[in-house]
Amino acid sequence: MKTVFFHGLGQTAQDWKEVVQQLSISDVDCPELFSLTEDEISYSQILGDLEQRYSEVKEPLRICGLSLGALLAIDFAIRHEEKVDSLVLIGAQYKVPSLLIDFQNLIFRCMPNKVYESMGLSKSSTIKLAHSMRSLDFTLQLNNIRCPVTILCGKKDTANLKASKRLKELLPQATLHIVPNAGHELNKYAPNTIAEILNQ
């Protein structure tokens, strides 16, 4: 079974490196989400590219996603239940808070262009991508997810902690792990915790 990692906004596939190094499995895929497309970047474009990438898979995937990656994992599982064996959702939202996106975009606008170079996205593309996620709301479709789900959230990730707890309530088959002394980017703060769960 292939394990797939979807990184977050402001990250690259390299941010999964410490997790992957600790895995007892070798069939792993970490796509660079922002270089999948040559078109103008948007949430729906990235999702479409992922659907195409995994259109020929012969057995269900185990998908691990962080933040934006968790949204994509949820969406993919809703649309392609037969292609998903299980989900690991990190710092996840299932209904994107538009105020949070607007605040995030305000911060993005103030950041210097050189900050974006390592992300593989320009400032304007980052802002457009975040804006394209404003209306995402999977609340009514979550009951289509029947596979096992593990939810992880850093205790210091105050922006996503409440949503993670609520997501656990909406997905009765899910387990929730609050990671002490950790923030939002658990693939950086607690890669060993993610690896332990994936190695079970």
Where are the regions a protein language model picked out?
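Active-site loop/oxyanion-hole signature of alpha/beta-hydrolase fold enzymes
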Residues: K17-Q21, D29-L61
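Catalytic histidine-centered segment of alpha/beta-hydrolase-like enzymes
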Residues: A182-N192
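Conserved alpha/beta-hydrolase "acid-adjacent" motif
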Residues: T158-A163
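Short beta-strand/loop motif that positions the catalytic acidic residue
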Residues: N144-I145, I151-C153
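Hydrophobic, aromatic-rich cap/lid helix
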Residues: K114-F138, K156
